[in-house]
C-alpha cells in the first residue's frame, strides 16, 4: 500500500482488532468522565524541549554569588558591558530572565508576556530519584508515571490515558476531528494509550494536504483469502484516516495568521518552533477542534559550547527561538480572539548540573524550570529558588518535596482546572493522588458556572485598607451556592481556608488577613462544585 504523507494513523491502526464496520463520526462520544472543558473548545499546547534544558541559565539566580562562582565562564552577569546581554529581572523578585528570552524577541518576549499576565514560571520541577537517561526520563515525563525502575515499561502517555478515559467508545467511535496533533516526527508516547494512538503526527501541513491522506489509489481486492481480507481491512483503516486529512485541509484553508506576525521563517534565528506554533495558530483559527497539540524543539543537550562569556552559544539561541515562538503565538491568539481558549506548557526531561564542565557546557542534572503561557495562567514565579548548598552526591540540585515541585502536579492542574476533571479523574490518569499546582485559571466561565466573569477570572483581590497584611477578595455569584476559598503558597502547599460558607446570589467582598503569612506570592482558589477560579496575592513585609 502506498503511504503518501507523513500522517501517523496509529489511532486507527492501533485499534485493528475492533475497527471493522465502525462509524467514523460521533456527535458526543464522551461518557466516562465529567470533564467540562473536554467537550468545549479548551485547548492545550505542549512544547517538548528535548535534551534537558539548563534551568539555571534560563531563570537565573544572578544575585546569589555562588551562581557565578560555580559557572565562571557560562554565567549571565549583571555587569555585562552590553546592556542587551544583561539578565532581566522578573517582576520584583530576585530571579531573572536570560536576556535571550527578552531582548531581540517579538514584543519583549517572556518579559512582555509576564507583564501582560500571560506567563507563569515554574521553578524546581522534577521527581524523586531522578533518572538522567534522556530516553528513560523523557518516558517518565511523558507517561506521567514517576518510576525510574527500568523493569517498569512505560508505553502510554498521560494525555493518551486522559482521552482513553474520556472516550469510552473509542475506537468503536472516532471523533470528527483528531483529538491530538503532533507537528513532526513519529507519534509521541505522550499521545498513546492502551486503546491505540489518540492522535496523529504530521510534517509540513502543505505537503500533508497536497498528498491527500494515506489511502491507496488501488481498489479493494476481491475474494475471501486471508491476504485479501487483511489488505482490504488495512485499506479501510487508511480511508478513515483520510477523513482527518479533509478536516485539517478545511481548517488550514479557512485559517489565517495575523498580518505582521511572520511565522513563515522556518530557519535561522527564529527556527522551526516558530513555524510549528504558526501552524497551530492557523489551524485553531480555521476551526480545527483538536484538543492537544504537541510541538518540539531539540538541541538542549548542551555538554559543549553552551554559552560563552558574551552570552553567545547554542543555549541562548534556543531560548531566543522558544521566546519568539511563544510570544508570536500569543500575539496572534490575542489578535484573532482565541487566546482565552488556549494554554501552553513546556516540558524537558531534566535540567543540568549547577557546575559548568570543562567545555563551556553543562552535564545532565535534576530539576529545571518550566513555563506555562496563556491568558488563563497565574502570571508569577512558582517554586523556591535553587539552593546551591543542598547538592546530592553527584553535585546535582537535590530534589526535596518540601522545596521542589513534582512535575505531575502540572498535569494534575491541567486535568482538573483546565479540563474540568475531579481529583479521582486525576488519580486514574496519573495512577497516583497528585495535588495540583494552582498555576491556572479555569477556562472562561461556562453557562453553568455560578461565578460571574468578574475581574480576574471571577475572583479579584484588592488591598483596600492600605496594608500589606490585609485586603479583600471580591467576587460575584449569579445563584445561591456553597463557596470555599483556599490559600496556597508558591509551592502549591495548602496554607489555610479563607472562607467556607453557603452564600446568596450577588456581589461579595471577603476580608483577608495575611498577617500570619510570610512575604511571598500566594494563590487564592475559589471553588464551588466543579468550578474553580484563582487569583494571586503578593505579601510584602
Language-model segments: which ranges?
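Feature for exported/extracytoplasmic and membrane-associated proteins, marking the mature portion
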Residues: 2-336, 355, 373-444
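Active-site lining segments that contact anionic ligands and/or coordinate catalytic metals
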Residues: 290-292, 339, 347, 365-368, ...
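Histidine-centered active-site microenvironments of extracellular/periplasmic hydrolases
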Residues: 348-379
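Glycine-centered coil/turn sites that cap beta-strands in beta-rich domains
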Residues: 446-487, 509-514
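Short, glycine-anchored, charge-dense loop/turn motifs used at functional sites
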Residues: 488-495, 522
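C-terminal tail/sorting-segment detector
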Residues: 501, 505, 511, 515, ...
Amino acid at each position: 500500500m502506498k503511504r503518501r504523507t507523513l500522517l501517523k494513523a496509529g489511532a486507527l491502526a492501533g485499534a485493528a482488532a475492533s475497527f471493522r464496520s465502525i462509524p467514523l463520526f460521533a456527535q458526543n462520544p464522551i461518557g466516562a468522565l465529567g470533564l467540562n472543558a473536554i467537550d468545549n473548545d479548551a485547548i492545550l499546547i505542549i512544547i517538548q524541549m528535548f535534551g534537558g534544558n539548563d534551568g539555571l541559565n534560563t531563570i537565573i539566580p544572578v544575585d546569589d554569588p555562588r551562581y557565578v562562582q560555580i559557572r565562571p565562564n557560562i554565567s549571565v552577569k549583571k555587569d555585562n558591558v552590553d546592556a542587551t546581554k544583561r539578565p532581566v529581572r522578573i517582576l520584583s523578585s530576585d530571579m531573572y530572565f536570560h536576556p535571550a528570552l527578552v531582548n531581540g524577541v517579538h514584543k519583549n518576549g517572556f518579559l512582555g508576556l509576564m507583564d501582560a499576565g500571560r506567563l507563569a514560571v515554574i521553578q524546581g520541577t522534577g521527581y524523586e530519584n531522578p533518572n538522567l537517561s534522556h530516553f528513560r526520563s523523557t518516558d517518565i515525563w511523558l507517561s506521567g508515571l514517576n518510576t525510574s525502575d527500568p523493569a517498569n515499561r512505560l508505553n502510554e502517555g498521560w494525555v493518551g490515558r486522559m482521552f482513553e478515559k474520556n472516550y469510552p467508545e473509542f475506537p468503536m467511535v472516532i471523533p470528527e476531528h483528531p483529538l491530538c496533533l503532533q507537528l513532526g516526527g513519529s507519534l509521541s508516547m505522550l499521545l498513546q494509550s492502551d486503546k491505540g494512538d489518540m492522535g496523529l503526527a504530521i510534517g509540513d501541513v502543505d505537503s500533508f494536504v497536497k498528498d491527500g491522506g494515506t489511502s491507496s489509489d488501488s481498489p479493494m481486492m476481491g475474494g475471501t483469502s486471508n491476504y485479501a481480507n487483511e489488505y482490504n481491512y488495512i485499506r479501510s483503516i487508511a480511508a478513515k484516516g483520510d477523513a482527518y486529512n479533509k478536516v485539517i485541509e478545511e481548517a488550514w484553508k479557512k485559517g489565517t495568521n495575523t498580518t505582521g506576525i511572520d511565522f513563515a521563517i522556518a530557519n535561522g534565528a527564529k527556527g522551526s518552533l516558530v513555524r510549528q506554533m504558526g501552524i497551530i495558530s492557523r489551524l485553531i483559527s480555521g476551526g480545527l477542534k483538536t484538543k492537544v497539540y504537541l510541538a518540539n524543539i531539540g538541541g538542549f543537550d548542551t555538554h559543549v559550547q553552551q554559552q560563552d562569556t558574551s552570552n553567545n552559544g547554542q543555549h541562548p539561541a534556543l531560548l531566543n527561538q522558544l521566546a519568539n515562538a511563544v510570544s508570536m503565538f500569543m500575539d496572534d491568539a490575542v489578535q484573532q480572539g482565541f487566546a482565552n481558549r488556549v494554554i501552553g506548557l513546556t516540558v524537558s526531561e531534566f535540567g543540568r548540573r549547577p557546575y559548568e564542565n570543562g567545555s563551556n557546557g553543562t552535564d545532565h542534572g535534576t530539576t529545571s524550570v518550566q513555563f506555562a503561557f496563556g491568558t488563563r495562567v497565574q502570571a508569577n514565579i512558582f517554586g523556591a529558588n535553587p539552593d546551591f548548598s543542598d547538592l546530592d552526591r553527584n553535585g546535582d540540585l537535590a530534589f526535596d518535596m518540601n522545596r521542589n515541585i513534582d512535575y505531575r502536579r502540572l498535569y494534575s492542574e491541567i486535568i482538573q482546572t483546565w479540563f474540568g476533571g475531579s481529583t479521582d479523574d486525576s488519580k486514574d490518569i496519573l495512577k497516583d493522588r497528585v495535588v495540583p499546582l494552582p498555576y491556572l485559571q479555569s477556562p472562561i466561565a461556562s453557562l453553568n458556572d455560578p461565578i460571574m466573569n468578574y475581574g480576574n477570572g471571577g475572583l479579584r483581590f484588592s488591598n483596600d485598607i492600605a496594608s500589606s497584611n490585609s485586603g479583600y477578595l471580591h467576587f460575584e455569584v449569579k445563584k445561591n451556592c456553597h463557596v470555599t476559598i483556599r490559600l496556597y503558597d508558591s509551592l502549591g502547599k495548602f496554607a489555610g481556608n479563607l472562607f467556607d460558607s453557603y452564600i446568596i446570589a450577588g456581589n461579595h467582598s471577603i476580608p483577608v488577613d495575611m498577617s500570619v503569612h510570610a512575604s511571598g506570592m500566594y494563590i487564592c482558589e475559589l471553588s464551588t462544585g466543579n468550578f474553580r477560579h484563582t487569583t494571586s496575592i503578593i505579601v510584602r513585609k
